[in-house]
Amino acid sequence: MLCAASEYLPYQSESMDLVFSHEVLEHVQDDALAVSEMVRVLKPGGRIALFCPNLGYPFETHGHYWKGKYHFGNTPLINWLPRKLRDKLAPHVEVYTRKDLARLFAGLPVKFIERRTIFGAYDNIIERRPALGKLLRGFLQALEKTPLQRLGLSHFWVVEKV
């Protein structure tokens, strides 16, 4: 196991069968370079399993800044503000639309196997309030099969190198 910046993976080209990126992309300095590196290290036929925050989710889960002070927690509706204002309140983390993600993969030798938006498992709520948490999870995950899935917590993409 190695620790490295996502933009400069210390692996040989075409050396990996799978790159698993779970809620990482939004934290890197150069997301386009990080995606390019993921593709570079994949063998042909290798896959990226990518999860990253959806701009359509009604809460900013990474907290926000207000008057120079950081406030931890889920903040409602920040992601729905105009992008310039949203980025001032949450400059430490990126969020993505489907088009934003597609742009990151543009021109790379890949094909898309799965592209959808998902809601979370809400295990932390289930742990504290089991009945409510399970009801909430069931309801929100049922929304994944409706047009309201665009409000999901995260993008889940499976991308294959060709």
Give the positions of each predicted feature.
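A short beta-strand submotif of the Rossmann-like class I SAM-dependent methyltransferase core
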Residues: 21-24
